[in-house]
């Protein structure tokens, strides 16, 4: 069967550098870091004392105070970004089309903050002190659940939780749901709020986080010799995907087309990639095959680029193996240098950055890349954004614990 074309018609975002898509994008092109000291719990006993936090967040105009008390912050972030995306798309939900519109929204961890709070209540006061809303306030699929209820969406509702690849996997699979005719539109993306005592402590115990407490804004430095781990980030990214003819018929604004989606597994280690980046390479190869294009046609790669010693080198090797001679020409940058790592929301916000790069013909920089590490010798767009003129395809990479990999390819339209 022939696949239907899938386009992006709406965008929504909360990030450490902005509470809307456009404010975030403006900050990224200016090379602004959103990393700051953690101020919502005492970090004196923690090795890492900073993260990429969502700032000045208020959702009272979208979610009542009563309902907010029944939701972890990641759910609130996801709902707000989802509402932004739906409003941006102009998609009207009616009784006639509601069964053809769905949601695919994930999270890497889910409601960690309220899990911690309810466990504390259990320990201090016994099971009677656990909130009756504990389960629906924390489980991963509740962003999709709330948005489908708010908008009356009766199409597919799924939530893929694949660690840091969750965002890309939800977007890619939402696109396939549309491509194969099971829906005409989907809200897709990811949401995360892991800057909690257990989140910061857990990743810190694994020695995965940077400990550059004297200069947090310089801590996320992908491919730099002095990198010492990733920086946690909070936020959400949501996209409205539509079948091309459906979008065109209603006169929708079209940002880009999703032309390729690839997945793979490392089958190597729980938390580390193989040095040759074979799993990451396979995801990119599968996405390129799905898009039916050659590697040299990709002008920009929004890299996973987490600022970890092993991960950055492995992704560099993966790009070299997939792109061959074209690897020296493709622009590769890590927006995590500014936002930190949004875990299950990373692939969603970075898909949006890839789409905006196509729209504005502008490549966001990799900040803090002062001294590239040995073997990290691609065009990483250091320090400053770059204006281009002929960018047609952008590729977005996400890789996660457990060796799960995903790549999306977007085309300017």
Model-flagged regions — what are they?
Residues 1-67, 245-257, 352-366, 411-413:
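ACP-dependent fatty acid/polyketide chain-elongation machinery
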Residues 1-8, 95-98, 291-297, 328, ...:
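Flexible, low-complexity linker/loop segments at domain and module junctions
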Residues 5-9, 36, 214-291, 300:
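Condensing-enzyme catalytic core mediating Claisen C-C bond formation in acyl metabolism
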Residues 8, 29-162, 191-202, 295-311:
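Conserved beta-ketoacyl condensing-enzyme motif
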Residues 22-27, 113-127, 177-180, 200-213, ...:
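A glycine- and small-aliphatic-rich helix-loop capping segment at beta-alpha/alpha-beta transitions
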Residues 78-91, 140-144, 148-192, 231-252, ...:
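Active-site-proximal alpha-helical scaffold in enzymes
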Residues 124-131, 172, 176, 180, ...:
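Glycine-/small-residue-rich "gating" segment that lines the acyl/pantetheine channel
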Residues 268-277, 306-323, 342-349, 379:
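Short glycine/threonine-rich loop-to-helix capping motif typified by GTGT followed
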